[in-house]
Curated annotation (Swiss-Prot):
Annotated pathway: Amino-acid biosynthesis; L-histidine biosynthesis; L-histidine from 5-phospho-alpha-D-ribose 1-diphosphate: step 5/9
Glutamine amidotransferase type-1 domain span: 1-212
Recorded superkingdom: Bacteria
GO molecular function, one term: lyase activity
Matches recorded under PANTHER family: IMIDAZOLE GLYCEROL PHOSPHATE SYNTHASE SUBUNIT HISH
Gene that encodes the chain: hisH
Protein name: Imidazole glycerol phosphate synthase subunit HisH
Amino acid sequence: MLAILDYKAGNQTSVRRALDHLGIPCVITADPAVIAGAHGVIFPGVGAAGQAMNELLTTGLDKVLKDQVQAGKPLLGICVGCQIMLDYSQENDTKALGIVPGECRLFNAAWTEEDGTPIRVPHMGWNSIVQKRPCELLKGIEPEAEFYFVHSYYPAPPESYVIATCTYGEEFCAIHGGPGLWAVQFHPEKSGRPGLALLRNFYAYCKEASRA
């Protein structure tokens, strides 16, 4: 079973629907015991980093998440979840979780597309990613597959944590982390076949890890 972290940050229901479609058992929960008993945790989020962190701190779920990561529980952050896994976000000048080193930065409106057109912020719509190093999440997914993005800020971890990038005016990190600890800036639950494949891969990894 996968635990979808319930901290009033938006897209838990759409994540659950995607997992239901795949036949993957899951529950939306804020119960530490349920989270501890799950094969893995999905940490979704939409909205503002400051508000999301306030919810985590108010409910104590920040500590629950960190404890599970320390215990080796697989974790998948999505969108704002991906951003606040880092140390800091420029959005609302937010001290974040610090699970992964790095910061989250606002897109530079001076960046331009290849034809010289200024980018629009937020970055919204389908865009391809380029894999930089092997990752279990991307098994069987076509190179440069397209995923659905909606965001004004982007993660900027150290290069050694960058798994895949996307280009929107300039190249930015689209997936970061390491084995069992991943974060994706796009929305896999809204990304059609590639997104469903990524969620399926995460669950397969979680099940295998639980047997180890």
